[in-house]
Swiss-Prot record:
Protein encoded by which gene: cmk2
A molecular function GO annotation: (d)CMP kinase activity
Species of the source: Haemophilus influenzae (strain ATCC 51907 / DSM 11121 / KW20 / Rd)
Known catalytic reactions: CMP + ATP = CDP + ADP; dCMP + ATP = dCDP + ADP
SUPFAM superfamilies xref list: P-loop containing nucleoside triphosphate hydrolases
Protein name, per record: Cytidylate kinase 2
Highest taxon above the source species: Bacteria
Length: 222
């Protein structure tokens, strides 16, 4: 079974997906992390973030691994743990810019679809239910206001001992939302057959839906 969870940055997708993967014993695909790793590699190699061809060539040759360790999934690039590096605001903004290019998305599409070879998969991203896994058995879309997501992000940074500026975080989220929702290639939107949940919806009810044959009352069709 493939379960897709789409939505904007900071809506709680990662928290839900990890809980579901752990509960069901499924593999986890964090597509946002894949784009962040691509962006990190581009920044490290000083690749022009406006050069679609060079970025796509870089994406085609990335060695990315998701490895469960100590209760969380760590992300490795060419054998190096980059889990913390890809969570910086600089990389997040770069990832949103990289993700608008068709050639980059095409280069990373097969890499993402290869995860479906697992017996069960939880796929977290922006276009998992619309583009990458359009035939997924269960599709969810998590959403929340930019303000709520900025508060969540600010708190996450504080908990990690990272200083953050709330106003800057909010502005960057709004800018990223605009790019994600208005890009020509695979814009952020719910799949027609997805169930929609707000950040305030019960995560337990949402998780329950994914492992049952009938939806709970906490979600609505998009």
């Amino acid at each position: 079974m493939i379960i897709t969870v789409d939505g904007p940055s900071g809506a709680g997708k990662g928290t839900l997906c990890y809980a579901l993967a752990e509960k069901l014993g499924y593999a986890l695909l964090d597509s946002g992390a894949i784009y962040r790793v691509t962006a990190l590699a581009a920044l490290q190699r000083k690749t022009d973030l406006t050069n679609e061809t060079d970025l796509a060539e870089l994406a085609r040759h990335l060695d990315i691994q998701f490895i469960p360790q100590n209760g969380e999934v760590n992300i490795f690039l060419a054998g190096m743990d980059v889990s913390r590096l890809i969570r910086t605001q600089e990389v997040a903004d770069a990832a949103s810019k990289v993700a608008v290019f068709q050639k980059v998305r095409s280069a990373l599409l097969q890499l993402q679809q290869d995860f479906a070879k697992n017996d069960g998969l939880i796929a977290d991203g922006r276009d998992m239910g619309t583009v990458v896994f359009p035939n997924a058995q269960v599709k969810l879309f998590l959403d929340a206001s930019a303000e709520e997501r900025a508060k969540r992000r600010y708190k996450q940074l504080q908990n990690k001992g990272i200083n953050g500026n709330f106003a800057q975080i909010l502005a960057e989220i709004k800018e990223r939302d605009f790019r994600d929702r208005n890009r020509e290639v695979a814009p952020l939107k719910p799949a027609d057959d997805a169930f929609y949940y707000s950040l305030n919806s019960s995560i337990i009810s949402c998780a329950f839906f994914t492992i049952s044959s009938e939806p709970t009352n906490s979600g609505t069709r998009s």
